[in-house]
Amino acid sequence: MGSNEEGNPTNNSDKPSQAAAPEQSNVHVYHHDWAAMQAYYGPRVGIPQYYNSNLAPGHAPPPYMWASPSPMMAPYGAPYPPFCPPGGVYAHPGVQMGSQPQGPVSQSASGVTTPLTIDAPANSAGNSDHGFMKKLKEFDGLAMSISNNKVGSAEHSSSEHRSSQSSENDGSSNGSDGNTTGGEQSRRKRRQQRSPSTGERPSSQNSLPLRGENEKPDVTMGTPVMPTAMSFQNSAGMNGVPQPWNEKEVKREKRKQSNRESARRSRLRKQAETEQLSVKVDALVAENMSLRSKLGQLNNESEKLRLENEAILDQLKAQATGKTENLISRVDKNNSVSGSKTVQHQLLNASPITDPVAAS
C-alpha cells in the first residue's frame, strides 16, 4: 500500500501542473531544492497535497506532522495460516477451501492426481465442505490426512495472498490517477479466476470411500487423500528428492570417486616407497664408495709392507752369506796351519817306519 500512498499525490500534483502549463507558458518557477526534498522525505513518503512545483518554494512542515493518508481500498485476501483453525471448518470467507492451481505447483499436482481435474458446482462449496467435514470428523484415521491437506492449502493460500498483494500493489501503482476502477477490475478478474478452483476439493474429497459410523477405518481409507497432500510436497521438494536413476548415478559417481581416491592413495604410497628406496640406494652407494676408498688405502699399505719385508729379507740374506764366507775362510786357515806342522814334524823325525806314512 506504500506505493499507492506514494504514487497518488505525485500524479495529482502533475495534473494541475500540466493544465496550467499553457496558461503560464512564460512563467518558469521551479523548486530549487528538489533533490534536497527528495533526500529529506525519502522514496517511501508521499509529497504533501498542498505542494506545487510551479510555485516558489516555502517552508514545509516536518514529516512527523503529516497525517497518514487513508488507504484507497480495503485490504482483502486470505489471512495468514496461524489464524486459520487446523480443521478448516470455521475458515475465513475469503479463504478458498480447495487447492489453488498457481504456478508449477498446480501443474505437478494435476499431473499426479486425477481427482483435481473433476469439475464440481462452486455455488454450494461452503455448505458441502461443512457437512463433509462434520462426517469426516467421526473418523480417527482421516483426521490427520485432512489436517495435513488443510495445512498445505493454507500454505498455498498464504502464498497466493502474498502474490495477490504484490500484484495489487503493482496495479495500484500503475493506475493511481484518482480512480480505482482498474484495481476493482483486477480484483474481479482474480476472484473469477479463483472461483473455479473452490469446487475442486469437494470433488476430490467426495471420491473417498465412506463407511458406517460403527465400522473402523482401514489403512486404505487415507490413501486417496494422500496424493493431494503429497503432490504439493513432492512438487515443492521435487528438486530435493532424488529419483531412482539419480540415486544410481550418485552411487556410480561415489564409486568412481572412491576408486579415484584409492588409486591416488596407492599412487602416493608407491611414490613414497620409491622415494625411500632411492634414499636407501643413495646411502648404500655412498657407503660403497667409502669402503672402496678404504680398501684402496689398505692395498697401498699392504704393498708398502711387502716391499719393506723384501728389503729386510735381502739384508738378512746378505748378512748370512758374509758369515758363512768368514767361517769357511777361518776353517781353511786352520787346516792349512795344522798340515804344515805335521809335515815339518815328519821331516824332522827320520825313522823308516814313519817315512812311508808321511810320504803317503
UniProtKB/Swiss-Prot annotation:
Its biological purpose: Binds to the G-box motif (5'-CCACGTGG-3') of the rbcS-1A gene promoter. G-box and G-box-like motifs are cis-acting elements defined in promoters of certain plant genes which are regulated by such diverse stimuli as light-induction or hormone control. GBF2 is found to bind asymmetrically to the G-box.
Keyword annotations: DNA-binding, Nucleus, Transcription, Transcription regulation
Gene3D superfamilies attached to this UniProt entry: 1.20.5.170
Subunit structure: DNA-binding heterodimer. Interacts with GBF4. Interacts with BZIP16 and BZIP68.
Entry's Gene Ontology cellular component terms: cytoplasm; nucleus
Biological process, per Gene Ontology: glucosinolate metabolic process; response to blue light
Protein name as catalogued: G-box-binding factor 2
Keyword Nucleus: yes
Annotated family: Belongs to the bZIP family.
Transmembrane stretches, start-end: none
GO function term, MF aspect, one: transcription cis-regulatory region binding
Comp. bias (Basic and acidic residues): 246-264
Composition-biased stretches (Polar residues): 1-16, 198-208, 335-352
This protein's record includes keyword Disulfide bond: no
